[in-house]
């Protein structure tokens, strides 16, 4: 899987890109919110950003969204939804999603 991930000069620049629809920025903003990096930890808001990026086929966001459904972070725990998002990501070659999908079976 090619590493063509973007980087931003500041958190504010990343947030602006996310708000403008950049899927990678949305994914990273979700990670920041999930982990409380640079912002207050907020699982529900993290899920919102993961979903925006996942709906644009971002495999990292799809994997994180699957993890949220697996663990019940920010959403009700739903193994079927976890599998759905891990599968979407795994089909794009994400190794973490492939591992997590395998663990569900």
Per-region residue spans from a language model:
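Low-complexity/repetitive intrinsically disordered segments
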Residues: 88, 95, 102-105
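Hydrophobic face of amphipathic alpha-helices that form TPR/SEL1-like repeat modules
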Residues: 28-35, 64-71, 100-105
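Short helix-capping/linker turns of helical repeat alpha-solenoids
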Residues: 19-22, 35-37, 42, 55-59, ...
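Leucine-rich, hydrophobic repeat-scaffold detector
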Residues: 10-24, 31
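N-terminal leader/linker segments that initiate helical-solenoid repeat arrays
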Residues: 1-9
């Amino acid at each position: 899987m090619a590493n063509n991930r973007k980087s931003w000069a500041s958190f504010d620049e990343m947030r602006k890109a996310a708000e403008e629809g950049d899927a990678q920025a949305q994914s990273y903003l979700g990670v920041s919110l999930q982990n409380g990096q640079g912002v207050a930890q907020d699982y529900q808001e993290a899920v919102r950003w993961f979903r925006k990026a996942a709906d644009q086929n971002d495999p990292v966001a799809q994997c994180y969204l699957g993890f949220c459904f697996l663990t019940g972070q920010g959403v009700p725990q739903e193994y079927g939804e976890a599998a759905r998002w891990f599968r979407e990501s795994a089909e794009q070659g994400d190794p973490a999603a492939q591992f997590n999908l395998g663990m569900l079976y």
